[in-house]
Amino acid sequence: NKILLYMKGSPDKPQCGFSQRATQILMACGKEFSFVDILSNPDIRETLPTVSNWPTFPQLYIEGELIGGSDIMMDMYQNGELKKLIDDVEI
């Protein structure tokens, strides 16, 4: 999955405001993305913050690289960086 969002809930039913904002940003970028609901996957919810060295969710990965959470996504979206990064991904 080249664009992967670890989030609370699903894009159709996000379970927190940050996850909702992250999915809205990704949808606005216009490319298909995958997601993992960490509420349904407690092992991932416990392990990923340690592995990624990022304590909160959502977490966006593009081509295996951690981009950040919803605040970073919003900043990058507003300045055009995120759309460019996503546009460069071949799915």
Regions found by a protein language model. Give the residues of each.
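Non-catalytic, surface beta->alpha helical segment in thiol-disulfide oxidoreductase systems
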Residues: 62-91
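Local sequence-structure signature of Cys/Sec-based thiol-disulfide redox active-site neighborhoods
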Residues: 1-32
